[in-house]
């Protein structure tokens, strides 16, 4: 696999996305009060340098300008007259590595606190409320060296949003009352991660290096580091926050990216006006020239006990910081070869031995001054017994690379592939794009910031050899992760409690690895035959349609076709659903369908890896209705890959050894569900309760023992014997070619698997349980791993229809920001607080999801109290405020997809739901604009109020591991906080003891009727 890992700490902030669609975008609005100026000729003392020659993709129609402000801020401006959303991001080149040693997590805490009011806009939720009212959203993350803040907003409101945003860096309040509450949010965020193996392993890696190096710090922080210990030591954390912000939030460490409809000159004026006053404290850029892994930290073996039943091997080498060599990228070159998955690769050989299934190789970010090179594999049961041999194979492959020397043709192939990827780059969503660019501005020259991570320029064999020279046994660190080490460890990591044992790797083992000889099985990759060569953009056909058209409708298949008329890139999305009544008929068949496709993908991996490197990807998964197959990106070689996959599906022969290995890995993944987050458990149980047919993890585990190799071999022809295929072919493809592709898929299945069409009566659709009026049901379970509770409260409203969809979505839009502000920011229920629509099988409702240390019945009472406050808030809402919400939702719904795959996903969602409402957004927004405040109040009073006649409610309570029991409902009269709104008295709910009995006792909703007349849809 490809390179690298990224670790982020971020608060999930609320928000809404997307924007109003017009046949033609209105011209960019001028920003008030800014005279038109041409910056190429003018002089402005606030601007030190202007860079208008930004190298961009030939397909990129946006205009770019780089600035360096006099105060040192680097800026990239993007003018896109077609954008629905404007966006901005600011990246401060300071992160958790700069935390004071005695207050771990301070930079992350500072990131949280900046959202909670500024001198100019003191209201705690001013920023989030402004964004919510204008179809916007925001977030931030803290990493070792960066704190990155970003938002998006309806394009008309960039100036208002940017003004509020700029105050974070000019005059934040960092208010003491907010501080005490927000510590809980950081603590809840950490608590969410405590039992997550990825976080645990990351911190353990940091803890086992040089303890005096900033890399060893605990970046997230928690209540102990941000409140308890500082209080004990007489440290005023608010004073430390103010000091941290005033010290490090210096303009010379900041970079900004702004994207809007405005002209570059107007965007320049706006940024100068809002950010030129940020103070330059001339803070030296933190650098870390010493590596955290010194001689005493090398040749060490760490045996680590995970939470989940996983088996992994991590091999790490310290290497110098390669950032300055980005034009030749030696780490990328070596990662490409060591991480290759084709014939003759390291992975191929380790898989053939039955020791591993997957491999990741490449450079991993450290910080300014140091990096790592990693080779990580998962281990089979057999592989766990052969760790020394696996690492020997790694060194044999590295020795092969040394013997062969750097290959210019390999570098050239990487260079060519990256150049094609850059040339035909998809347009990114504004929010992610600005956030990413703001971070890059610290590392690359302004004119090359868009190309730097794509375009390779210089073949530098000397640098490749330099990095290769670091990949030696004397520099190695090895970590093995396995449940088999339980009870055999002698150390505990401080912050996450990870159990581990550290041993020096014996000298004779190091010597054995040093003597690694050439292994004749290893080969360098051959030339990639999947590299696209035909980039022709096909002209639109005469009968091209604005939405997918049904161009084939037979007993065997339905084919929907849409020629791309928006993006004009040499790409296509081919989506297929193979309906089979055998795929989900019982847990045994569900398991067999899963294993068949996992084994199929496993056997295709060597072949398909070259396609993936060449920008051609595929996906293959089992579904409750059968199998899903997609082939995406460059259309040139898609038919070749699709034919190979289809032939393999129809003629597949199972390898016995791979069957045993993949079955065992599947059993572990089923067992590992117990360690998922409490809120994920709540969502899982609700799906089981509400869907007509859904197999539990326990049922699947029990049935897995019955899956034998002969049984699976017999199942495959049964699965393929009768199918109905529904497909969407969308992109740079003609109608004739689409028909040809569909025919090829059908012919292959008929020829090799003797596939026949399904009978119409075999096309089963699962339905949703219909709750009774005024019914309230509670289902309780315990999470055995996490010490947090989780809850999902679901108010089922009705079947999906234009009117019902808009009632629900508008109500969700109105309550979204207040919900987050009330339940998370003010009441501090937990880090994860979510409200929004839930939709399944054509039925919908309002849901709340919370994860908290507080008990579920308390969370339930707070949600009910919040809903009552929202009724009054809507009643008191001005017409202007109500219309803002309608507009925000309309903008979000009409936001144009930024790339072909996103547009295709919308259409595919309509096909999979069998609703086929391809013009849904326009139809529903037209209805939305007719709604009144009274409509929403009526909707609330009829469906959601405590005494509503058509209230239908299910609550799933997931208890923390240390809670033996908990009442399902309770009153909380002794609340200390007088500001809490009063919770209503709740009736006693019906407790669900048996899911099957619960579902048997209730009717099912009918299926939603398709939006379209199939006879009229045919071309």
Curated annotation (Swiss-Prot):
Keyword Mitochondrion: no
GO biological process: amyloid-beta clearance; amyloid-beta metabolic process; antigen processing and presentation of endogenous peptide antigen via MHC class I; bradykinin catabolic process; hormone catabolic process; insulin catabolic process; insulin receptor recycling; peptide catabolic process
CC cofactor note: Binds 1 zinc ion per subunit.
Localization per Swiss-Prot or TrEMBL: Cytoplasm, Cytosol; Cell membrane; Secreted
Active site, renumbered: 111
Cofactors that this protein relies on: Zn(2+)
Pfam families linked to this entry: Peptidase_M16, Peptidase_M16_C, Peptidase_M16_M, PqqF-like_C_4
Effect of gene knockout: No visible phenotype, but mice display impaired degradation of insulin and APP-derived peptides. At 17 to 20 weeks after birth, mutant mice display increased serum insulin levels and decreased glucose tolerance.
Note: ATP-binding induces a conformation change.
Family: Belongs to the peptidase M16 family.
UniProt name for this protein: Insulin-degrading enzyme
Organism taxonomic ancestry: Eukaryota, Metazoa, Chordata, Craniata, Vertebrata
Gene assigned in the entry: Ide
